[in-house]
Amino acid sequence: METKVIAINRRSANITEGKSRAPNRSMYYAMGYEESDFKKPMIGVANGHSTITPCNSGLQKLADAAIDAIEEAGGNAQVFGTPTISDGMAMGTEGMKYSLVSREVISDCIETCVQGQWMDGVLVVGGCDKNMPGGLMGMLRANVPAIFVYGGTILPGHYQGKDLNIVSVFEAVGENAAGRMSDEDLLQIERRAIPGTGSCGGMYTANTMSSAFEALGISLPYSSTMANPHDEKLNSAKESARVLIEAVKKDIKPRDIVTKKSIENAVAVIMATGGSTNAVLHFLAIAHAAGVEWTIDDFERVRQKTPVLCNLKPSGQYLAVDLHQAGGIPQVMKMLLVAGLLHGDCITISGQTIAEVLADVPDAPRAGQDVIRPIDQPMYAQGHLAILKGNLSPEGCVAKITGLKNPVMTGPARVFEDEQSGLKAILDGKIVAGDVMVLRYLGPKGGPGMPEMLAPTGALIGAGLGESVGLITDGRFSGGTWGMVVGHVAPEAAAGGNIAFIEEGDSITIDANQLLLQLNISDAELESRKVGWTAPAPRYTRGVQAKFAFNASSASKGAVLDDY
């Protein structure tokens, strides 16, 4: 990509230059600006710091470091806030329905502030799951030079010689309910699982999306697997600010970086690292914001040619900090590049291509570690996020299929209209091996907000039923989920999807080998059940949930709000 040097304040000049803008400049003077500052670029800092969650409570120091570096590099830092929801805290409650909504609110905040204030560039600092897709969607809509600074991963907790993370606690609840763990051990795991700041430590949603941002080239190399408490994270934030100022000078914008080829790169890295099912939903939305043609079937295309190289939780053994020590995302990317599974000509925020960024990275992982496998000895020959279709999900749904002893099951439906009743049935011992749980009316419109469900899946794992009980839903799963689970079923129940017409005891087949999700009744029987069906009344009639339910597209299109 050829870059050209431009006036670095060309956007902000709209509100700072000329006699008619004297009132505007007066307001800047009130904040300590000098006349010379108006020739400098106005750089937004979208600060996701919050004391709501440890994922974001360590962000202020990164924002401060970036602000200082922006000023030192000749820019004016303009700080504004973006909200967050703690998925880990909201999980299993009505609050979880606000998680996906927050993705849209974050993107709206960034687009609104950047465009409303004529900013010349923006640096986004985020931590918890929806901060990443929401941040990038806002960056793409505004389409000014931009970079994402990830808050960093959390360090592991420890108990009885084992590493712990937030998923350990959810699974411990299930073990305790099944009589396999004492109350004292549950309490100790609860207290020790999260020792400090940073995002949840496995290849869960936050680390999945931040790793994908490295692969896109919208974040700096190695930044996604750094731990929040470590000094290198501060240094990375400073370097991100310096790189952004250069991108403003060269006019490198998000839509130059986020293309179909770079999304393929990101999805290849998601597959290679064993990332979260949520990445499917979020990259459909990111592609929409970028104006890139990308469908749910493209994930399956990339999956079939990309091996799983990393032995990472939830279905593997290690955490993001271990991946960092083993060479980080650049090592994984270099292996994929050498194997012809990555596009090396994609541009990054630094102005370098992916191939140039990876030039000095070894072709193969170092010996003596088991986090990153050699390309010819992968964890699995194909990716783990499979797109299933069938009469229960003609638009597609997402299953995490690696690590399962038997990726095929047929069993009787156990139908629940909400998450809480399904969780109670598990904890009360009413779900048995061979059952297929159906949790419905939890999609983008029906939830509304398409809540994640780590509590039921964690309870199944803890009860020893993770591979013997199936669970399908039009809602989502946490990045920490594993087992025989299928989410994002589309069309959703609230839109009249066939998941709405499953009856208790119906036979359901989940077949990851054949990429099939099937309700085993005749077409005639299925059609007869639809007679007289009407959509349920909205659960919310005012506020953000009502707006989300009214506007949200299908999960197969990313559950976006502007698919008009």
Curated annotation (Swiss-Prot):
Query: How is the co-factor bound, per the entry?
Result: Binds 1 [2Fe-2S] cluster per subunit. This cluster acts as a Lewis acid cofactor.
| Cofactor(s) listed in the protein's UniProt record | [2Fe-2S] cluster; Mg(2+)
In terms of domain of life, where is this protein from?
Bacteria
Instruction: Write down the HAMAP family for this protein, in alphabetical order.
Output: IlvD
Q: What is this protein called?
A: Dihydroxy-acid dehydratase
Enzyme class per UniProt: lyase
Catalytic activities: (2R)-2,3-dihydroxy-3-methylbutanoate = 3-methyl-2-oxobutanoate + H2O; (2R,3R)-2,3-dihydroxy-3-methylpentanoate = (S)-3-methyl-2-oxopentanoate + H2O
Q: How does it assemble?
A: Homodimer.
Q: What does this protein do?
A: Functions in the biosynthesis of branched-chain amino acids. Catalyzes the dehydration of (2R,3R)-2,3-dihydroxy-3-methylpentanoate (2,3-dihydroxy-3-methylvalerate) into 2-oxo-3-methylpentanoate (2-oxo-3-methylvalerate) and of (2R)-2,3-dihydroxy-3-methylbutanoate (2,3-dihydroxyisovalerate) into 2-oxo-3-methylbutanoate (2-oxoisovalerate), the penultimate precursor to L-isoleucine and L-valine, respectively.
Query: Listed GO molecular functions?
Result: 2 iron, 2 sulfur cluster binding; dihydroxy-acid dehydratase activity; magnesium ion binding
Residues at which Mg(2+) binds: D87, D129, K130, E452
Coiled-coil residue spans: none
User: Which UniProt keyword terms apply here?
Assistant: 2Fe-2S, Amino-acid biosynthesis, Branched-chain amino acid biosynthesis, Iron, Iron-sulfur, Lyase, Magnesium, Metal-binding
Tell me which residues this entry annotates as catalytic. Answer: S478 (proton acceptor)
Protein encoded by which gene:
ilvD
Q: Which residues carry this modification: N6-carboxylysine?
A: K130
Q: Where does [2Fe-2S] cluster bind?
A: C55, C128, C200
